[in-house]
């Protein structure tokens, strides 16, 4: 294509301007030409052939276009691909920089976690071979670029590229470049000896630029980079005649190099999402403002600006430029420049942030995507004498979390500090230069792929990084100590560094240990400080985590330099100085700050205040907010995993990481206690975050690589308390077994990582999720109690509102409501943190892994387990801590109640098998309360209790191992729980038996268990003991519940008589009301248990009768039934009439129906005799009253009533017969009397102790307790010896007595 003349270029450009176009034509020019700005045309001639490719070193001065601020970009100049100096309007620098910053920013993609997980070798260690993610990205980036084509880039073009990236010139001073006076002098003296190679030139350029900034006090060298109000005119003055400049419609920008109006209006608009006010065209004289306290929005306007009046063309162009958007990519904070004291301050009409404080303040780093708008008061003029190193700060608001919307600056306490000093501007310059290299590579991949250009760009990057290291050390200004904050932290927190910048900084400095420490220790300290000040009330909390995560992931070869540095910090694992070692570790250790973010109200009150303190918290709002908070937690925990995983991958720090993990576990052992002082242990949020990371580390572990005896290993990192309860062994048993196992063996082999990680994760569950669950349940209980108190106070208001205690009751009601509101909000936070279904599923899957390990210990043939197990309990299993089993039960109990949908996972089948195996082999567990917990889990999954777990319960009852052994095992436990060894055993047994009875009712409906039930019914001894316990429980429960109903009736009657009630003293009234409340609780509880027990009787007597008629059971059963009939229908039955009987679960008609059904189902001569022999409760009138009530209330059919009447008549006949044949045996000799009951023996037997008792009496005792009643030694029925001689003597005496009486 022919080259265009200067007149043709000028004509076309004026035509475009006249048409209102601001973009350039896309037709590339054959040689670099430059357009002129509006106004008087500037003569230009077409360059000669030698000038067509770039800048002549000897007679031309390179200059760059003001990339970024001025809105001027370069356009494609050559068909050979020299497009590094150009940009079309559709591919403006802003678009490219935004794209680059988003696609190549420091953000790690979501797959990185999974990729890093795939590198775990759990057999030999955590790392086998790993390819760095950054290396993969770089290779992928390079492979995407097109291969080099066309002629090689000349030296002139290379110089032009260098000058463009560094924005320098060494010939003419210009507003758009930094003039290098030293280089200019050298070029004038001997141009050929200025530099030996490009590396040398780059170093000279950077050093001169940076030294200029340090040596000039009243002039800022970077001020020349701030575009004027007429960027095209400025470009026209550029000494580089080969550059074609234009005013793009979407120019690339930089917050460092922007025009006054552009920065004032648009930069803050982009940074804070505020709407910029229109920028007026006034560029005349304005008052001078001091630099130190200037508003951040005017920082750029304090750079040196020519004070000469601008031409009309300039003003017009400046107005247009002022409306250009400005990117905030590399300036997370707007700072005040110390060189602006002599310049003219151009006031911006945009809203300005709050005034800068005179003392350093922490400033929150911002998200580059979403920021709330904010305005602040204008700043007063400041004295020009403010020092240049005076620190100032600016609040940068993070983007909001779940609630969205804007927020005032003062609502954020997250803040950081950045000094407004020369180092900041030097860093801005170096970061911009580094980023422009990437922009050039993206714009011109063909040219940049040429080896020479690629090497040049690599040198530029390296030199930028090297000089950044010098700046960070203070080598160019004042040396900095390790305690001073790093200038780089704010950029990292804002995610504003170019891709690869921080990695290159690590690569460049890590080989010099001192330099590396001097640069990165302040960075690490700054990130930790940022993490401490973060909260989940905004999404800013993740940025310190992301920054540290990326630092830790940076590796070179097999070394992670930052991981080495982190693990070498003095506070990596500080020694404990107080009893509160758990809280100390969280507060003082380096990683503690990063693991501490939490949604729990007791950990972070800001979360509950922001999300759950509205006037009306609806269920839907709470659900949405909870999901958002759970998403935040997931993001933060993923970053924590990257950090700890990187430290583990690094071979040099793996031991330190494992030591830290073990220290967290060991320091928080007290969290497992039922009552814990929260001040001494880590917070729930910290522990759950720690648990989540360990779960991720354990995901790929195979059980074949886990040593189940690790907890007994001499080099085990976990310290168990000496009093830790074992599954089925005492500490003496454990010590003896360990001596036997390891006493004569050679030294132990080192534990492998999979084993250590598995057990650390197991103990982390014990110390995190389960204490949190217990706290959650306690909170729910407190909410219920407060609700009940509030309801009682409201319901009884009519009784106390006119009493002297009215004021006290109102205050109590107010306090209860306030506390209730607080607890409900705390519960909402806990719902978000604890009821996260995905998190609960992870816990369940890990417990599934634990169950597999336990089942392998119980039976090596797993999964082909056969029951019953070997009678000898494996010593490994017996010696394990009891909570290994208990935690499984507790966690299942929790999710069945509060998140049953999380129950169905692939591991569910193993969980079902484990429950069945443990319940069918109760001898494997020493603690009966642990077996009771497993029973309670099965009870809770019963469809009658939790309909959503029906499938799980069906898996249990239909499991092949359960059909034969589950029913007998539960029946045995029903009787064994009579004696648990605890002081509360008498009351505990009722709840446990209630659970078993409910399970039996469900199993009875399953045809697969019918045969087992019938076998048990007919087997004799076991079932007889079971029936005896049923009789005992029914007797006690019905008696207690009916007695409590009588007391309730009595108090209610007193309170109905208001006059009599008011005459009672106040303390007596309170005592009666307190007794009423207690009786109501007791009656509700006991009636529920009694109803279940009677239901069981009703079912059993319908199926089988013979066991109930045994001599040791029949009379007791008949006496129990007669007594309860007397309670329900006797002369005092009216005492059971209470208000709202359904409130207590009292259904007298149903109870009478069931009791009379039991009579009918056991109707036979033997049972009739047992009824007649009960002289305590039976009477003819009682049975007549029962028949009358059943007829009157229609409780039974006529046929059933007639059958009951026939039974009553049969019993009455036996009573009359007994009366006629009654013989008095009260004068029997003492040797014929039973020593326990003092009645005449009919079948004497000798106990091992030598005592002689009646067989029926001792058998009845053995049903309750298998011990000798006189010395408490173990006693069974087989140990009883008949005494036939004594029996014959007793019978002879009885015959003699009968004959004498007649």
Swiss-Prot record:
Annotated disulfide bonds: none
Enzyme type, top EC level: transferase
Biased composition (Basic and acidic residues): 134-147
GO cellular component: cytoplasm; nucleus; ubiquitin ligase complex
Domain U-box: 1227-1300
Phosphoprotein listed as a keyword: yes
Metabolic or biological pathway, per its Swiss-Prot or TrEMBL entry: Protein modification; protein ubiquitination
One term of GO molecular function: ubiquitin-ubiquitin ligase activity
SMART domains assigned: Ubox
Low complexity compositional bias, start-end: 16-33, 76-99, 340-374, 384-400, 1066-1077
Keywords, comma-separated and alphabetical: Acetylation, Cytoplasm, Nucleus, Phosphoprotein, Transferase, Ubl conjugation pathway
A Pfam family it matches: U-box
GO biological process entries: ERAD pathway; granzyme-mediated apoptotic signaling pathway; neuron projection development; proteasome-mediated ubiquitin-dependent protein catabolic process; protein autoubiquitination; protein monoubiquitination; protein polyubiquitination; response to UV
UniProt KW Electron transport keyword: no
Quaternary context: Interacts with VCP/p97. Interacts with STUB1/CHIP and UNC45B.
Domain free text: The U-box domain is required for the ubiquitin protein ligase activity.
Job of this protein: Ubiquitin-protein ligase that probably functions as an E3 ligase in conjunction with specific E1 and E2 ligases. May also function as an E4 ligase mediating the assembly of polyubiquitin chains on substrates ubiquitinated by another E3 ubiquitin ligase. May regulate myosin assembly in striated muscles together with STUB1 and VCP/p97 by targeting myosin chaperone UNC45B for proteasomal degradation.
UniProt protein name: Ubiquitin conjugation factor E4 B
Organism: Homo sapiens
Source lineage: Eukaryota, Metazoa, Chordata, Craniata, Vertebrata
């Amino acid at each position: 294509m022919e080259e265009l003349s200067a007149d043709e270029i000028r004509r076309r450009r004026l035509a475009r301007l006249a048409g209102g176009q601001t973009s350039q034509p896309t037709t590339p020019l054959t040689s670099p030409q430059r357009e002129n700005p509006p106004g008087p045309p500037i003569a230009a001639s077409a360059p000669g052939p030698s000038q067509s490719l770039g800048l002549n070193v000897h007679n031309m001065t390179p200059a760059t276009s003001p990339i970024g601020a001025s809105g001027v970009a370069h356009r494609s100049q050559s068909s050979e691909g020299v497009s590094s100096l150009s940009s079309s309007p559709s591919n403006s620098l802003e678009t490219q920089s935004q794209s680059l910053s988003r696609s190549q920013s420091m953000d790690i993609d979501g797959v990185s976690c999974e990729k890093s997980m795939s590198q775990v070798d759990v057999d030999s260690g955590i790392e086998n071979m790993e390819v760095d993610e950054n290396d993969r990205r770089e290779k992928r980036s390079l492979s995407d670029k097109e291969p080099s084509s066309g002629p090689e880039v000349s030296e002139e073009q290379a110089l032009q590229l260098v000058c463009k990236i560094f924005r320098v010139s060494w010939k003419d001073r210009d507003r758009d470049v930094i003039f290098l006076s030293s280089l200019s002098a050298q070029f004038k003296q001997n141009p050929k000896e200025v530099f030996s190679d490009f590396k040398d030139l780059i170093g000279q350029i950077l050093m001169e630029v940076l030294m200029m900034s340090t040596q000039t006090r009243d002039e800022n060298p970077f001020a020349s980079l701030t575009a004027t109000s007429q960027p095209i005119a400025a470009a026209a003055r550029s000494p580089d005649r080969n550059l074609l400049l234009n005013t793009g419609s979407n120019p690339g920008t930089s917050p460092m190099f922007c025009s006054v109006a552009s920065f004032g209006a648009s930069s803050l608009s982009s940074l804070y999402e505020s709407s910029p006010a229109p920028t007026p065209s006034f560029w005349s004289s304005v008052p001078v403002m001091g630099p130190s306290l200037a508003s951040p929005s005017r920082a750029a306007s304090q750079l040196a600006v020519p004070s000469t009046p601008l031409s009309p063309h300039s003003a017009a162009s400046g107005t247009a430029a002022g409306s250009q958007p400005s990117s905030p990519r590399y300036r997370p904070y707007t700072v005040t420049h110390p060189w602006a004291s002599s310049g003219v301050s151009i006031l911006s009409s945009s809203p300005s942030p709050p005034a800068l404080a005179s003392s350093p303040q922490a400033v929150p780093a911002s998200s580059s995507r979403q920021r709330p708008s904010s305005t602040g008061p204008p700043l007063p003029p400041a004295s020009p004498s403010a020092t240049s190193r005076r620190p100032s700060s600016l609040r940068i608001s993070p983007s909001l979390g779940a609630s969205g919307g804007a927020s005032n600056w003062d609502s954020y306490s997250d803040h950081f500090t950045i000094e407004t000093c020369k180092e900041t501007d030097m860093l801005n310059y170096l970061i911009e230069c580094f980023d422009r290299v990437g922009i050039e590579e993206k714009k011109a991949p063909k040219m940049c792929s040429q080896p020479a250009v690629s090497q040049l760009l690599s040198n530029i990057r390296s030199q930028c990084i090297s000089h950044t290291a010098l700046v960070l050390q203070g080598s160019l200004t004042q040396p900095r100590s390790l305690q001073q904050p790093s200038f780089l932290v704010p950029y990292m927190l804002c995610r504003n560094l170019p891709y690869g910048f921080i990695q290159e900084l690590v690569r460049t400095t890590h080989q010099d240990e001192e330099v590396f420490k001097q640069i990165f220790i302040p960075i690490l300290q700054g990130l930790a400080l940022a993490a401490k000040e973060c909260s989940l009330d905004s999404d800013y909390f993740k940025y310190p985590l992301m920054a540290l995560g990326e630092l830790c992931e940076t590796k070179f070869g097999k070394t992670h330099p930052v991981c080495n540095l982190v693990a070498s910090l003095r506070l990596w694992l500080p020694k404990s100085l107080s009893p509160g070692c758990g809280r100390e570790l969280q507060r003082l250790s380096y990683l503690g700050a990063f693991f501490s973010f939490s949604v729990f109200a007791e950990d972070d009150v800001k979360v509950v205040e922001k999300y759950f303190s509205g006037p009306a918290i609806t269920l839907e709002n709470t659900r949405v907010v909870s999901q958002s908070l759970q998403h935040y937690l997931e993001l933060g925990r993923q970053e924590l995993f990257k950090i700890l995983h990187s430290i583990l991958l690094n071979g040099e720090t793996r031991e330190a990481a494992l030591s830290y993990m073990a220290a967290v576990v060991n320091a928080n052992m007290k969290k497992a206690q039922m009552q814990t002082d929260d001040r001494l242990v880590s917070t729930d949020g910290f522990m759950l975050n720690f648990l989540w990371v360990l779960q991720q580390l354990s995901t790929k572990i195979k059980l074949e690589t886990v040593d189940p005896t690790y907890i007994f290993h001499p080099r085990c990192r976990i310290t168990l308390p000496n009093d830790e309860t074992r599954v089925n062994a005492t500490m003496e048993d454990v010590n003896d077994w360990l001596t036997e196992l390891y006493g004569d063996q050679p030294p132990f082999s080192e534990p492998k990582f999979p084993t250590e990680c598995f057990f650390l994760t197991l103990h982390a569950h014990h110390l995190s999720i389960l204490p949190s669950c217990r706290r959650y349940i306690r909170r729910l209980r407190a909410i219920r109690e407060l609700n009940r108190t509030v309801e009682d106070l409201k319901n009884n208001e009519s009784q106390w509102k006119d009493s002297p205690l009215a004021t006290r009751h109102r205050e109590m009601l107010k306090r209860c409501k306030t506390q209730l509101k607080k607890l409900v909000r705390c519960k909402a936070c806990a719902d978000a943190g604890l009821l996260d279904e995905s998190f609960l599923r992870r816990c369940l899957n890990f417990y599934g892994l634990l169950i597999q390990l336990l089942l392998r210990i119980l039976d090596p043939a797993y999964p082909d387990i056969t029951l019953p197990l070997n009678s000898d309990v494996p010593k490994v299993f017996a010696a394990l801590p009891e909570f290994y089993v208990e935690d499984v039960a507790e966690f299942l109990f929790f999710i069945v109640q509060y998140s049953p949908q999380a129950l169905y996972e692939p591991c569910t089948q193993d969980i079902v098998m484990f429950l069945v195996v443990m319940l069918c082999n109760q001898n494997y567990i020493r603690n009966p309360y642990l077996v009771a917990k497993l029973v309670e889990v099965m009870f809770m999954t019963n469809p009658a209790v939790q309909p959503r777990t029906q499938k799980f319960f069906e898996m249990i009852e239909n499991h092949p191992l359960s059909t034969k052994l589950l029913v007998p095992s539960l029946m045995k436990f029903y009787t064994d729980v009579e004696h648990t060894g605890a002081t509360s055993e008498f009351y505990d047994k009722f709840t446990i038996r209630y659970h078993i009875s409910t399970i039996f009712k469900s199993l009875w409906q399953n045809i697969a268990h019918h045969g087992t039930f019938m076998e048990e019914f007919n087997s004799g001894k076991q079932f007889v003991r079971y029936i005896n316990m049923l009789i005992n429980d029914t007797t006690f429960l019905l008696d207690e519940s009916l007695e409590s109903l009588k007391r309730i009736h009595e108090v209610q009657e007193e309170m109905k008589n208001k006059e009599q009630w008011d005459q009672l003293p106040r303390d007596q009234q309170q005592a009666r009301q307190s007794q009423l409340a207690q009786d109501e609780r007791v009656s509700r509880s006991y009636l529920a248990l009694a109803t279940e027990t009677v239901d069981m009787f009703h079912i059993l007597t319908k199926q089988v009768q013979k066991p109930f008629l045994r001599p040791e059971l029949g009379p007791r059963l008949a006496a129990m039934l007669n007594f309860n009939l007397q309670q329900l229908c006797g002369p005092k039955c009216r005492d059971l009439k209470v208000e709202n009987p359904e409130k207590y679960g009292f259904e007298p008609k149903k109870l009478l129906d069931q009791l009379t059904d039991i009579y009918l189902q056991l109707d036979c001569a033997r049972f009739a005799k047992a009824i007649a022999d009960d002289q305590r409760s039976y009477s003819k009138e009682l049975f007549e009253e029962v028949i009358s009530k059943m007829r009157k209330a229609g409780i039974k059919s006529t046929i059933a009533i007639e059958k009951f009447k026939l039974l009553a008549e049969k019993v009455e006949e036996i009573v009359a017969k007994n009366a006629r044949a009654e013989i008095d045996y009260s004068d029997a000799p003492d040797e014929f009397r039973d020593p326990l009951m003092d009645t005449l023996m009919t079948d004497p037997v000798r106990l091992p102790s030598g005592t002689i008792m009646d067989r029926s009496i001792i058998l009845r005792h053995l049903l309750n307790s298998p011990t000798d009643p006189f010395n408490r030694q173990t006693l069974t029925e087989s140990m009883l010896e008949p005494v036939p001689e004594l029996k014959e003597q007793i019978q002879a005496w009885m015959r003699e007595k009968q004959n004498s009486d007649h």
